[in-house]
Amino acid sequence: VDGVEILPDQMMHGTPHPSEETLAEWDRLCRGYGIKPVIADVFLNTNLYDNRTLTKKECVSLLIEEIKLAHRLGMNMIRLVSMTPAFVLEPLLPYCEKYDMKMALEIHAGLSFDKQKTKDYIAEMKRLHSPYIGLVIDTGIFCKREPRVMENYCRALGTGEEPIAVVQKLYEQGGDGRSIYGEDGAFIPALAAVLKSGADHMYAHFADGYENEPLSVLDDLMPYIFHIHFKLFEMTENGEYSVDYQEILKYLHDHDYDGYVATEYEGNRWTIPGQPMAEKEQVIAHQKYIRDCLKEIQG
């Protein structure tokens, strides 16, 4: 592993103003493991209060503090959580320049290119055309099939085979989890007819969190792509079960991408109750697979 990506809100007590003791421990860990701090994943809790959303000034002020913290941690990039409003970009540019900090919105399955706030961000990104404003691509938008670990988790909680079969067929036909909805926003008849229990409905609402976009959606965005999350649901002997990383790495190589790709393991959330979690084994296998693919592609 060459670098590390962290979520300070979850992993560093007191964020965005951790104690000196916490910062000293961070410095010690970085020195001890010899790993480069790469990117901080930051959130913007616009719904922090019950009775109102944050003002534009409050949003910008919070992100300024996140930029300062990421700089202190030795990073030069922050990931903006999906749906971050585009209005924060221009006011933050002077701070990005001061701290040499890139900002990159995460394009995440379920919140990707078809969402208006994502479209607004991309439009503002292109308007400003700054080397400090870009994107993080989450490869959950490139699922060739639904994660099997999610299906098995739902089965363990009582989901029947019929709803799962409907969604699997959608993928076979070139669709994805979003295809379970009709134009009216309701479940398509084929799925609605087989939802017979609470566990079936639970599965259906999980199913829309994965997309099956073509890699060509990135063609005109490559100059703005700063970082990529290589989503990991389940490693098999032949690679990741849902995502074709050989194909993705070849695409990135052919388009001269030179940023990091980061293993992001999410199979742990689908661990069946009573079964051991295999996060270390899964991440190690994924990292090895990525390196093997790169050796083959790069020669």
Model-predicted regions and their roles:
Residues 18-25, 56-64, 86-93, 117-122, ...:
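Charged helix-capping and loop-helix junction motifs
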Residues 29-32, 36, 46-183:
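Active-site acidic/histidine proton-transfer and metal-coordination neighborhood
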